[in-house]
């Protein structure tokens, strides 16, 4: 029998897409690893994720046949293969899924025939090495395989309900407990009887001989709440085939790590780590993880301590720890990126575009973890040496909290040593920390609308895009002290709901409007407007006169000056977001914002501080767009239409079917429900006031606009002029004069240190003569005026060299405070401990201190007690020497 031809991973991708394009399929790009249409899903973990709404009938596409190569991730959440990666033949964090789809078009006959054609005619797989499974009641699929394809019945396996319930089977697919579902047929490759394992459905099915390569799902039923299956009017096909395991078969190897793509990555990892054994499991881990980490960063995820960012951090740190195991102590992981780009850049052009961003983000994380990895491993070794088979949860939490060790990394290390982590104890420690954080962060609780009130109201109609005031606003609900009332009186603090309103309710980072509601004999001062249950505008304020009742008709007028300042800042936020992505890279994603009348605050993903030069460029770009005076266009459209229009959606946000798109020239196009200027020139001036870190991987910029920016610049000029006057020059000389002052200060500090050293040297010579002999040990306990802790330590070092076996206590007094240093040198070290001695002295002068057996330091209050404490040192030493 002739061996099948070999195919490269790249060729397999292109063959698959070309084959189905020839069958009338639209080739669809891979969706990002971060699902845009499913907030319940951490990552895209299968090919069907981007088509989920199509199958559910919530979305229409312009095609009925599609094919794609989808990048997928399984690490975190329900689908998590992280612990197995590197140790098994076919587990990966990142993998590619080949898929073809029919949305009410072709069905079983074509799907099966085309799968067989591609496998046996294009890729030349021997038909006698292929075996298929069908759901036990799917007679149609069974007959197609037997009668049309010609597979003997002996190689068609019926799989029943093998998961303990009706339709709970490896060969019956369902999206949820109800909804689209149907049988599937799977194609397996037989590696031969030299490998252990039996066919699917047999007791030995978990062996490695028969490997599933393609799953064809036939969605033909709608499962009802009572469990019955109703035929769908337009059945669909959803197929999935793992690229890596298919490549292993087409390249005549048994494990995925032996295919061309992985062999190149493993070779690069070996070169960077100095490991020649390419079978090393740590090299496999590194090769796998570079794909997952790189594509997560491409898709906008950066390392952080929560959500998707924390999953990325866990994967990176697992790879770094495996590098550490191989003896690597220098950055190496980010150096894998160019090789990955060479291998996968043609298939994924977005990787090529983001390669520098990926490398910088990985490098920054390497540097961050390197600071704690060695120390953390020492702590782990200490814990492991005093534990039996279990790493206590409290210690695992300390490794996580102090040294940045994700708990699954600690579990990984423990497993390698035949141990396990007390996960219950770890979760207890985590929850205790969460409770502490919650307690520290508690403030006045929010108000929730009663369910019956929500059911009785219609969503508030917002008029504020076009109008700053409005009449005929009907009061539909009043809350007083958080409870619905029919009437409220003057002086009452209330939340008023009307059927319509010009007041913007706080959302999307923009603060709510303030202003006034008024009617015959009643006035409400509105301090804020909040959104309740996502659709009702609540006017938060106080009744200043009269009484308010349900059904009253009011007029509303917002504070136009406050709104006017706010819209400048909101529109500037959009320009800032675009400028950040242009200057820093497309990895920048909004992580939070505040748009207030007096300032804007914008939080975004970025892995390092922004330089002064970068900030200057960002500010210039925003102001250039302001001066261009773009018209600001507003478009209302369907979500998919908005994305096709180029609108940027925020990761993690859930949008409705129809969205509002804000476009500023060709520079910024975003989904936004806020209020904005009509032209960018209205912003006037944009000025950044600060930049800093919020958390790991998240930066913050604060800025002002319009008159606020002019006032800020005027204040800066005033301060600069004041500084120039203090320095005795003009504003152009400030930098030079400050530089000269700084250099002079440094010179004086060096001279001062030199004088202190000479003083300490002279004092040391005198102190040696004052030493008292206690049982053959020289004891010195003295007060030194004006000595700081450093000068005391220098004097201590000289005295130890001069005296040999000795116990020394030095007290530096200055400004009513005392710095203490205690040292033990030579023979008394075992009996006299510096930390205990210093603690004994400090306790007598209202202070504290401690340290090592040979050196300790502390402090306290100056006064008569210090002399008494120092005088008692020789006796204390004598008692401890025995």
UniProtKB/Swiss-Prot annotation:
Zn(2+) binds at residues 570, 574, 672, 676. It is an enzyme of class 6 (ligase). PROSITE patterns: AA_TRNA_LIGASE_II_ALA. Binds 1 zinc ion per subunit. Its cofactor is Zn(2+). GO terms for biological process: alanyl-tRNA aminoacylation; negative regulation of DNA-templated transcription. The keyword Protein biosynthesis applies. GO terms for cellular component: cytosol. It catalyses: tRNA(Ala) + L-alanine + ATP = L-alanyl-tRNA(Ala) + AMP + diphosphate. It is found in: Cytoplasm. The keyword Metal-binding applies. Its EC number is 6.1.1.7. One of its GO terms (molecular function) is alanine-tRNA ligase activity. Consists of three domains; the N-terminal catalytic domain, the editing domain and the C-terminal C-Ala domain. The editing domain removes incorrectly charged amino acids, while the C-Ala domain, along with tRNA(Ala), serves as a bridge to cooperatively bring together the editing and aminoacylation centers thus stimulating deacylation of misacylated tRNAs. Catalyzes the attachment of alanine to tRNA(Ala) in a two-step reaction: alanine is first activated by ATP to form Ala-AMP and then transferred to the acceptor end of tRNA(Ala). Also edits incorrectly charged Ser-tRNA(Ala) and Gly-tRNA(Ala) via its editing domain. Belongs to the class-II aminoacyl-tRNA synthetase family. NCBIfam families: alaS. This is Alanine--tRNA ligase. It comes from Xanthomonas axonopodis pv. citri (strain 306).
């Amino acid at each position: 029998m002739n061996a099948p031809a070999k195919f490269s991973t790249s060729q397999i991708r292109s063959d698959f897409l070309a084959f189905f394009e020839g069958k009338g399929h639209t080739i669809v790009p891979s969706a990002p690893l971060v699902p845009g249409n499913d907030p319940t899903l951490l990552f895209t973990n299968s090919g069907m994720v981007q088509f989920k709404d199509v199958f559910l009938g919530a979305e229409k596409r312009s095609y009925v046949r599609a094919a794609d190569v989808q990048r997928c991730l399984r690490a975190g959440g329900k689908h998590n293969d992280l612990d197995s990666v590197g140790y098994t033949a076919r587990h990966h964090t990142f993998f590619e899924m080949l898929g073809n789809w029919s949305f009410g078009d072709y069905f079983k006959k074509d799907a099966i025939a085309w799968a067989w054609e591609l496998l046996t005619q294009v890729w030349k797989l021997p038909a006698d090495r292929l075996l298929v499974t069908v759901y036990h009641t799917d007679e149609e699929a069974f007959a197609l395989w037997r009668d049309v394809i010609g597979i003997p019945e002996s190689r068609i396996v019926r799989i029943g309900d093998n998961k303990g319930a009706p339709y709970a089977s490896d060969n019956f697919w369902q999206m949820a407990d109800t909804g689209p579902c149907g049988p599937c047929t799977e194609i397996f490759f037989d590696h031969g009887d030299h490998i252990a394992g039996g066919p699917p459905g047999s007791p030995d099915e978990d062996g490695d001989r028969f490997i599933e390569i393609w799953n064809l799902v036939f969605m033909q039923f709608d499962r009802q709440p009572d469990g019955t299956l109703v035929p769908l009017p337009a059945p669909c096909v959803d197929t999935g085939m793992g690229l890596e395991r298919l490549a292993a078969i087409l390249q005549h190897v048994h494990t995925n790590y032996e295919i061309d793509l992985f062999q190149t990555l493993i070779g690069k990892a070996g070169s960077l780590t100095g490991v020649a054994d390419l079978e090393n499991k740590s090299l496999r881990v590194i090769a796998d993880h570079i794909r997952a980490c790189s594509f997560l960063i491409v898709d906008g995820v950066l390392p952080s301590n929560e959500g998707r960012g924390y999953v990325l951090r866990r994967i990176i740190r697992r790879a770094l720890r495996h590098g550490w195991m191989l003896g690597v102590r220098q950055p190496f992981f980010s150096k894998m990126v160019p090789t990955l780009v060479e291998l996968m850049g043609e298939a994924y052009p977005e990787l090529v575009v983001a390669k520098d961003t990926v490398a910088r983000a990985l490098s920054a994380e390497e540097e961050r973890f390197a600071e704690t990895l060695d120390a953390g491993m020492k702590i782990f070794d200490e814990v492991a040496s005093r534990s039996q088979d279990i790493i206590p949860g409290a210690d695992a939490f300390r490794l996580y909290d102090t040294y940045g060790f994700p708990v699954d990394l600690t579990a990984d290390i423990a497993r390698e040593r035949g141990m396990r982590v007390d996960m219950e104890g770890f979760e207890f420690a985590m929850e205790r920390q969460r409770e502490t954080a919650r307690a520290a962060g508690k403030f006045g609780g929010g108000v929730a609308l009663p369910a019956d009130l929500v059911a009785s109201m219609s969503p508030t109609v917002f008029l504020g895009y076009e109008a700053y005031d409005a009449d005929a606003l009907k009061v539909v609900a009043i809350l007083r002290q958080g409870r619905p009332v029919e009437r409220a009186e003057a002086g009452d603090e209330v939340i008023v709901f009307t059927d319509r309103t010009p007041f913007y309710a706080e959302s999307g980072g923009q603060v709510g409007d303030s202003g006034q509601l008024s009617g015959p004999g009643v006035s409400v001062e509105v301090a804020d407007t909040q959104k309740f249950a996502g659709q009702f505008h609540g006017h938060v304020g106080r009744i200043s006169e009269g009484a308010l009742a349900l059904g009253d008709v009011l007029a509303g007028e917002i504070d136009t000056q406050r709104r006017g300042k706010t819209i400048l800042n909101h529109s500037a936020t959009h320009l800032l977001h675009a400028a950040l992505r242009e200057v820093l890279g497309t990895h920048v994603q909004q992580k939070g914002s505040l748009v207030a009348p007096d300032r804007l605050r914008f939080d975004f993903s970025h892995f390092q501080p922004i330089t002064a030069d970068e900030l200057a460029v960002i500010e210039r770009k925003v102001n250039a767009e302001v001066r261009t005076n773009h018209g600001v266009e507003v478009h209302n459209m369907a979500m998919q239409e908005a994305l096709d229009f180029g609108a940027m959606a925020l990761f993690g946000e859930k949008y409705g079917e129809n969205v509002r798109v804000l476009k500023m020239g060709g520079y910024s196009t975003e989904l936004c429900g806020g209020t904005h200027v009509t032209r960018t020139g209205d912003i006037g001036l944009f000025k950044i006031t600060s930049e800093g870190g919020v958390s790991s991987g998240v930066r913050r910029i604060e800025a002002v606009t319009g008159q606020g920016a002019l006032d800020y610049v005027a204040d800066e000029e005033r301060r600069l002029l004041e500084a120039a006057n203090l320095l005795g020059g003009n504003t152009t000389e400030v930098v030079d004069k400050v530089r000269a002052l700084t250099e002079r200060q440094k010179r004086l500090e060096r001279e001062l240190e030199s004088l202190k050293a000479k003083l300490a040297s002279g004092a040391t010579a005198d102190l040696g003569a004052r030493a008292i002999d206690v049982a053959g040990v020289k004891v010195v306990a003295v007060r030194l005026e004006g000595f700081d802790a450093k000068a005391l330590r220098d004097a201590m070092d000289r005295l130890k060299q001069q005296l040999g076996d000795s116990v020394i206590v030095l007290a530096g007094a200055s400004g009513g405070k005392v710095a203490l240093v205690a040292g033990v040198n030579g023979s008394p070290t075992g009996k006299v401990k510096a930390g205990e001695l210093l603690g004994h002295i400090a306790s007598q002068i209202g202070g504290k201190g401690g340290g090592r057996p040979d050196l300790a330091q502390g402090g306290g209050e100056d006064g008569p007690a210090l002399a008494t404490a120092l005088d008692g040192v020789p006796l204390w030493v004598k008692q401890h020497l025995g």
